[in-house]
Amino acid sequence: MREAMEFKRPETFEDILNLQKELDKNIRDNRERVLEDIKLSLIAELIELNEETKHSHKTWKTKEYNRDKELEELTDVYFFFAQLINYKSRDGRFQIEYYCEEFEIFPGYYAGAYFTGLIYDLLDNKFRWFFCSLLTLSVKLGYTKDDILNCYWEKWQKNMERIGKEWN
């Protein structure tokens, strides 16, 4: 296994995709991971993110807002979305350029993004809509492209260390 220190902080969505490929290559799955697994992981992470926002669906609970935890959960969504894009582009027919270009105009997003809408787009295989809504949600939550790239890099390094220890 390569050490995480051989890699550098991502600066683009394409860098995230490449780091995700490396992470996924090193993780030993108990069975082949299929698109349905990745979609379910994304849905789980979207719900975890929602639970960390100021407007969680858990209206019956009071929980102190933690911006760092919210960003970490948002970054987890990007991890699994990168995994999904890599999975879909394995045969070369799924074009990643759109996603790389959209990430570059990250701060320009302004539209409504709702968690259930994200889930519907994912289930309907509307990955472009999902990604646009994810970028919009990121902005609405007050995060920048650098916030996502920095958090992704930190968490990627931790995940690489977890391989073979916490993750068997």
Language-model region placement:
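Flexible "arm" and connector segments at domain edges
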Residues: 1-168
